[in-house]
Amino acid sequence: MYKRQTKNGIKTKNNDFNFDKIIFATGYDALTGPLLSLNLVGKKKTKLQNFWNKSPKTYLGLMIPNFPNLFIIQGPGSPSVLTNVPVQIEQHVEWITNCLNFLNKNNKKTIEPTINSAKKWSDEIKRLADASLFMKAKISWYKGDNIPGKPKVFIPYPGGLPRYRNICNKVEKNQYKEFLIK
C-alpha cells in the first residue's frame, strides 16, 4: 500500500522503492484523444476535430456520421471502460464483422450512421449519465475534466453491457436502418 513519496522513490507499508524517475500517468485524453490525434477527414473534408468540437458524436460508439466505413472499437459512446474490456472488444469485433458481411451480401460499399441516430444516442448517454452518480463527480476523466478545453460531456455509454448488446443486436436484426448504406 502506497504511503508517500520519498526523496529517492516511494515508501509503501512494507518497503522502500528507489527510482531514478517517477512518472505520474495522469492527463490522458481518454476515449477521444487517440481518434482526434489521427487527424481524420471525412466526407466534404469534414475534420473530426471540428465535428467533435462540442462533444463526440457516434452511434453506438462504433461509427461516426460523415465518416463512412470508419469502424471504432471501444470508442466514445460505447460502454468501453465501464465494462469488462476484452468482452466488449469481442462484441464490437463480432458486430463489425456481421455488418461487413451484411454489406458484402447486399453488394453495398459504404455505411455510416445518420446524424439523427448519433444525436439520439448522445441524448440517451446523457439521460443515463444524469440519472447516475457519475455526474456527481466534480472532476472526472469520464467527462473530459482532465483535459483543458475538452468538451465536458459524459463519454462512455453507462447503460451496462447486457443492455448495450441488446441494442446492437436489434440494430443488426433491423438491417442497420439507423445508417446510410450505399
Residues of each region from the PLM?
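Conserved small/polar residues in nucleotide/adenosyl-binding loops
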Residues: M1-Q5
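Residue-level detector of beta-strand face positions
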Residues: G9-K11, N39
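Short hydrophobic core segments
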Residues: I10, F17-D29
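Detector for glycine-centered tight turns/loop "hinges" at secondary-structure junctions
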Residues: N14-N15, K44-K47, N107
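Structural alpha-helical scaffold elements that stabilize or flank donor/cofactor-binding regions
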Residues: N15-D16, M63
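FAD-dinucleotide binding site
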Residues: F17, T46, K54-K57, I115-K119
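Glycine-rich loop(s) and the adjacent beta-strand/alpha-helix scaffold that form part
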Residues: D29-S78
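C-terminal, flexible cofactor-proximal segment of oxidoreductases
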Residues: T58, N69-K182
